[in-house]
Amino acid sequence: MSTSTSEPGAIAGLPLGAEVRTDGDATGLSVAIVGGGIVGIALALGLVERGVRVSVYERAQELPEIGVGFAFNGAARKSMARLSPLVMAAVERVANENEQAYDNYWDGYTSTAEDDESSTASKRGKLLFRMPNSNMAWWSCLRSQFLNEMLQALPPGTVTFGKELDSYDDPFDTSDPVRLRFTDGTTAAANVLIGSDGLRSRVRQQLFATSHPEVCNPTYTHKTCYRAVIPMAAAESAMGLSKPHNHCMHTGPRAHVLSYPIAQHKLVNVVLFVTHDEPWVDGTGDEAISVPRMTRPGDKKVLQNRLADWRPEVRNLVAQLPDAPTAWGIFDTAEHPVPFYAAGRVGLVGDAAHASSPHHGAGAGFGVEDALALAVALGMATEKKQSVAAALQAFNDVRYDRTQWLIRSSKETGDIYEWKHFGVGGDPVKIRAELEGRQKTIWDYDVDAMAEEVKTRYEARVTSETTAHQ
């Protein structure tokens, strides 16, 4: 919360544009967040910062210890800083910056007669191009570490684990609150329900079950990924001394490999993507079930055979995978996008609203932008249902177009990395031009202007509602 002390009437210690409440330490508004992932917990901290009462319900029994790495760009960090100093402090404690001022894009497929498994040149391979990353300004970290830091910053009792949402009621035409029912038979109530429950959001499923059933569940993109977090020494052995310390993308036909350092350059996050023509069959072996699991057992030998013709450094990375790596199906909502992110007193954020493939590496960052926009809107609202609805609609108005663009562009970017995007193919010049334009849309975003637009739209809706009832 903040405003510059150089401005007339500024509050000491608060930056320009901060949302400052004048009606006490806490509002009468209560918010229930379903889903305790990165976006849900960041939103909770942002609401607490604005004096809003919040409860988070997470289906997992405890904090997951999945060693998945991911990265945040500069726009996401600006959103964190404005959400709450506690969010920014959390990421600063666990993240590391890219060592060099550019990202590297490599031909991971084409071998040459000079290639030798043990040579430095072989591990380096053919550089297609470098792109300056000062604008993207990546910070990388382990998901579990960042989440744990944010959880510790929340007031005790804010998060309840082991709570899986079964259903909810939003009696908008009455004065009753939104009521949540959990699978263990317990209930809860709040003025607002926010679904931050990810790809297979239970809140999304109920919100659109009758009106738009086709959007209730995401669709398989025919890409599967395999993840590994490996020691830096192993990565240096596989790729040489330089590559592991920077964002690297190895491109090629029907597959691509992303790697970048995490944990203060002690570890390297490796993500291998492979395109498959066949439908997704999950670990149950049943492709007909309506909501398949997103993971299934993998086989390193199958992957090694699939990439046997790729360059040595890529094969070396694949060798670092466990013998039975988990295969993660890549699902998104590109085929059936949700028509809106809020109705009544129920809203969706992050993957629950706009599940995207990970090829831009921006899904979590866009979710944090969502969290800021929603925290600003709800931080201005009262417990009155018209005020809540106005806040949620202001959030929807500001966030919908940008986040829907991400879904489409990320899917296309996955094809660009695999040399099959129409009109681009494997041409490095065209690949670079495509990526530069898309990345500019991601980083060239004014989060302060976004927050101000949320305020303006909220106030306009409240004024319109008030006028209509006079």
Swiss-Prot record:
The keyword Secreted does not apply. Gene3D superfamilies: FAD/NAD(P)-binding domain. GO terms for biological process: secondary metabolite biosynthetic process. FAD binds at residues 58, 71, 143, 351, 364. It is found in: Membrane. It is a single-pass membrane protein. It comes from the Eukaryota. Belongs to the paxM FAD-dependent monooxygenase family. FAD-dependent monooxygenase; part of the satratoxin SC1 cluster involved in the biosynthesis of satratoxins, trichothecene mycotoxins that are associated with human food poisonings. Satratoxins are suggested to be made by products of multiple gene clusters (SC1, SC2 and SC3) that encode 21 proteins in all, including polyketide synthases, acetyltransferases, and other enzymes expected to modify the trichothecene skeleton. SC1 encodes 10 proteins, SAT1 to SAT10. This is FAD-dependent monooxygenase SAT7. It comes from Stachybotrys chartarum (strain CBS 109288 / IBT 7711) (Toxic black mold). The gene is SAT7.
